[in-house]
Amino acid sequence: MEAKATAKYIRISPQKARLVVDLIRGKKVDDAREILNYSRKRSGQIVGKVLKSAFANAVQNPNIDEKILFVKEIFVDQGPSMKRWRARAQGRAASIKKRMSHITVILDEK
């Protein structure tokens, strides 16, 4: 039985979020939480919240044993980008893309 949680429009670059997501793919939920707690990356906190939400969704189902849950799938998709402008020399402007992410976590029993 699967449990799923998704966080959309998170203001962090997908490239930076994937660095943390790759660390916990396939791990047990307890091990994944420990890894995220000691991660110094900002995306570690965000991914931790999504993992906690997926775990809470799994606990709602009485047929699921929470002790044997593991991260079956976790991925980061690119969301929309906010376009901003930064002033540059001699009256020019440079565009800046502030990227967003959609983070999805799927837990399952081993």
From Swiss-Prot:
Pfam families: Ribosomal_L22. The keyword Ribonucleoprotein applies. Keywords: Ribonucleoprotein, Ribosomal protein, RNA-binding, rRNA-binding. InterPro entries: Ribosomal_uL22, Ribosomal_uL22_bac/chlpt-type, Ribosomal_uL22_bac/org-type, Ribosomal_uL22_CS, Ribosomal_uL22_sf. SUPFAM superfamilies: Ribosomal protein L22. It comes from the Bacteria. One of its GO terms (biological process) is translation. GO terms for cellular component: cytosolic large ribosomal subunit. GO terms for molecular function: rRNA binding; structural constituent of ribosome. PANTHER family: CHLOROPLAST 50S RIBOSOMAL PROTEIN L22-RELATED (PTHR13501), LARGE RIBOSOMAL SUBUNIT PROTEIN UL22M (PTHR13501:SF8). Belongs to the universal ribosomal protein uL22 family. Part of the 50S ribosomal subunit. This protein binds specifically to 23S rRNA; its binding is stimulated by other ribosomal proteins, e.g. L4, L17, and L20. It is important during the early stages of 50S assembly. It makes multiple contacts with different domains of the 23S rRNA in the assembled 50S subunit and ribosome. This is Large ribosomal subunit protein uL22.
